[in-house]
Swiss-Prot record:
Induction: Constitutive (at protein level). Inhibited by p-chloromercuribenzoate but not by cloxacillin. Belongs to the class-A beta-lactamase family. The gene is pse1. It catalyses: a beta-lactam + H2O = a substituted beta-amino acid. This is Beta-lactamase PSE-1. The keyword Disulfide bond applies. Its EC number is 3.5.2.6. GO terms for biological process: beta-lactam antibiotic catabolic process; response to antibiotic.
């Protein structure tokens, strides 16, 4: 974490990576697209030198649960502005429960702080906790307005859980682009969108994610660290956004989105693993 924070002021202008450097990654992604009959978007941003590479980086994909990082960043921002108290509590009502709420479903009739709701949704992807946060930050519109404020003109949130995960082709609602969300994560963790204290908190929530062990974490190079958030939805949507770094490697922001495929969840997970491994190999091969 100390290494990650050391780069918080290093946000150079984005420069495109040489195509040869990521040639194998592109070949691997294309092969997976064909094998799964899927649409795939990938973005990679090196925060040390601003080097950027993408595949379908400007295409729209369903946000699914990757929106939760944005919603919690909005809560942290609003707390800085004195608009909300993260220690304020919300009563958990049975009528508010939605599908997949492993933390909140056990606390019906109790109260939860907004801070704890963010911890729950960021570490377990609890959907009711996410809706609690959305209610506190002005709903989907509040999140989208925040994104526009920090310069993200693409990412948008229109609905709450679980409807936002619908994932229909051509539906602009609740979508992002791999390039846009990578840039937004850069602003959250290394830019001026949040204070250093809240950058640390957001990073900590992502580091402590409990539901991504079978994705990029499973092929993370030895000695590397990861902070991530995944998502899944209809019509084959599967996604992950992550920051990876090591003692000798500046943070790299990675976003991978899959959509419009009939592949099983296991196959989609395997696709993310293979793409991640290919990306990591670009950086580990440089140090061999």
């Amino acid at each position: 974490m100390k290494f990650l924070l050391a780069f918080s002021l290093l946000i150079p202008s984005v420069v495109f990576a040489s195509s040869s450097k990521f040639q194998q990654v592109e070949q691997d992604v294309k092969a997976i697209e064909v094998s799964l009959s899927a649409r795939i978007g990938v973005s990679v941003l090196d925060t040390q030198n601003g080097e950027y590479w993408d595949y379908n980086g400007n295409q729209r994909f369903p946000l699914t649960s990757t929106f939760k990082t944005i919603a919690c960043a909005k809560l942290l921002y609003d707390a800085e502005q004195g608009k909300v108290n993260p220690n304020s509590t919300v009563e958990i009502k049975k009528a508010d429960l939605v599908t997949y709420s492993p933390v909140i479903e056990k606390q019906v009739g109790q109260a939860i702080t907004l801070d704890d709701a963010c911890f729950a949704t960021m570490t377990t992807s609890d959907n009711t906790a996410a809706n609690i946060i959305l209610s506190a930050v002005g709903g989907p519109k509040g999140v989208t307005d925040f994104l526009r404020q920090i310069g993200d003109k693409e990412t948008r949130l229109d609905r709450i859980e679980p409807d936002l995960n619908e994932g229909k082709l051509g539906d602009l609602r609740d979508t992002t682009t791999p390039k846009a969300i990578a840039s937004t994560l850069n602003k959250f963790l290394f830019g001026s969108a949040l204070s250093e204290m809240n950058q640390k908190k957001l990073e900590s929530w992502m580091v402590n994610n409990q539901v991504t062990g079978n994705l990029l974490r499973s092929v993370l190079p030895a000695g590397w660290n990861i902070a991530d958030r995944s998502g899944a939805g209809g019509f084959g949507a599967r996604s992950i956004t992550a920051v990876v770094w090591s003692e000798h490697q500046a943070p790299i922001i990675v976003s991978i989105y899959l959509a419009q495929t009939q592949a099983s969840m296991a196959e989609r997970n395997d696709a993310i693993v293979k793409i991640g491994h290919s990306i990591f190999d670009v950086y580990t091969s440089q140090s061999r």
